[in-house]
UniProtKB/Swiss-Prot annotation:
Keyword Aminoacyl-tRNA synthetase attributed: yes
Entry's EC annotation: 6.1.1.16
Name assigned to this protein: Cysteine--tRNA ligase
Motif annotated as 'HIGH' region, chain positions: 30-40
EC primary class: ligase
Motif 'KMSKS' region location, chain numbering: 268-272
HAMAP family recorded: Cys_tRNA_synth (MF_00041)
GO biological process, one term: cysteinyl-tRNA aminoacylation
Length: 447
């Protein structure tokens, strides 16, 4: 039985899908104006792992993750680079795909772009105006927060708290609002900015409306799971809920999931603070699987501190698992013991996708393997577990020359010519091949 920590209820809840055996899942994707940083990547990796585990447990997952390709940040970047907003979006979508492929992330069922849904967004806003949940003001359209039942319940805030916090605002936009906490559904464009025609004049959608429309148009009014980083709880996901439920009269999502931050020196990694490392740069010195494995060492909801030591530890541990995976079969496998490992792994992951505990089981199983319990069934079980974390080992085939040296060393040992055997072993070490003699034969690892 899978349990999910639901941000809305602040509790672990048994997962019950809307439709047996199927899951509708929407995860907020990147605003494509720059390379993603390691903190952004954690969200992508966390929900890819969750999606993979659902599939491991037999579910068919419709996994949607968008590209926000209409945004002020994209417009500003276009001005800086002297290209169009469309060219900015295309450039960084391509970079995103390259980065997450290196991290072993599966393509989403669909990666929608905002520009594909402009007519749907306008209809959505018109519907909210007709229902009295939104109003036009000088070419902008705002959502009436006070009409939303239990607004900000996701972020555990009250409307009174928000109104108190906004009471001192005097900027031009606030003057156009009925209430300072109302948020934009449609924003009028300035001269020279990218815009679309609408009943309220040329403009572009607000950020929050974009995800609501893409989710409902593709997956329907109510989905099983909506996810994203913890920083999206408020205002983004809060506003998605308000406008979506105002339009449909139905629950927007049955479970809300949020991943923790990546910290640098215990401070949240972010572009605004300037303390970030892009995945593009990290991959110049790190294998993508190492970074992916680093993320798996901590529960997805908890913050994780990005340090060189932590990453190098992940690299060492991953190498150990690769060497374990690539060793020759030994036979003598207790089928019940293998099943016990599988059951223990499922129990760990069923508890809110606790990858850290799941990885612990993998290492316990590796120790068991290295004590002489390895056959094809064990290898497949290990591969299946690791694949949930995006770790796929491509078995290395040794050069014929190296294979020949290993065979000659075996012959020398059989003839008790230990001097020659040692000489060959030392020669292999210089080529990065380390040999280990066991009761089941010789094993090699790439050093």
């Amino acid at each position: 039985m899978i349990k999910i920590y639901d941000t809305m209820s602040r509790d672990l809840r048994e997962f019950v899908p809307i439709e047996d055996g199927k899951i509708k899942m929407y995860v907020c994707g990147p605003t494509v104006y720059n390379y993603i940083h390691v903190g952004n990547a954690r969200s992508t990796v966390a929900f890819d792992t969750i999606r993979r585990y659902f599939e491991y447990r037999g579910y068919k997952v419709a996994y949607i993750s968008n590209f926000t390709d209409v945004d002020d940040k994209i417009i500003n970047r276009a001005r800086e680079e002297g290209i169009t907003p469309q060219e900015v979006a295309d450039k960084y979508i391509a970079a995103f795909r390259e980065d997450v492929t290196a991290l072993g992330v599966k393509p989403a069922t669909r990666h929608p772009r905002v520009v594909e849904f402009m007519a749907d967004i306008i209809r959505f806003v018109e519907d909210l105006i007709e229902k009295g949940f939104a109003y036009e003001s000088q070419g902008d359209v705002y959502f009436r927060v006070e009409k939303s039942h239990n607004y900000a319940k996701l972020a555990n805030k009250t409307l009174e708290d928000l109104e108190l916090g906004a009471s001192g605002r005097t900027d031009e936009e606030t003057a156009r609002k009925e209430n300072p906490v109302d948020f934009a559904l449609w924003k009028s464009s300035k001269p020279g900015e990218i815009s679309w025609d609408s009943p309220w004049g040329p403009g572009r959608p607000g950020w929050h409306i974009e995800c609501s429309v893409m989710s409902t148009e593709i997956l329907g009014d109510t989905i099983d799971i909506h996810g994203g980083g913890a920083d999206l709880e408020f205002p983004h996901h809060t506003n998605e809920i308000a406008q979506s439920e105002a339009k449909t009269g139905k629950a927007f999502a049955n479970y809300w999931m949020h991943n923790g931050f990546v910290n640098i020196d215990n401070v949240k990694m972010s572009k605004s603070l300037g303390n970030f490392i892009t995945v593009h740069d990290a991959l110049k010195t790190l294998d993508g699987q190492v970074l992916r494995f680093f993320f798996a060492t901590q529960h997805y909801r908890k913050p994780i501190n990005f340090t060189e030591k932590a990453v190098r530890d992940a690299e060492t541990n991953l190498k150990y698992l690769k060497n374990t995976y690539e060793q020759p079969f030994t036979g003598n496998v207790d089928a019940q013991e293998l099943q016990n490992f599988k059951d223990k792994f499922v129990a760990a992951m069923d508890e809110d996708f606790n990858a850290a505990n799941g990885i612990t089981v993998v290492f316990e199983m590796a120790k068991w393997i290295n004590s002489g319990n390895y056959d094809a069934s064990v290898k497949q079980a290990l591969a299946d577990m690791l694949e949930i974390f995006g770790i796929v080992f491509v078995e290395e085939v040794l050069d014929a020359e190296i294979e020949d040296l290993i065979q000659k060393r075996q012959e020398a040992r059989a003839n008790r010519d230990f001097a020659t055997a040692d000489q060959i072993r030392d020669q292999l070490v210089t080529q990065g091949i380390k040999l280990l003699d066991t009761k089941d034969g010789v094993r090699w690892t790439r050093d």
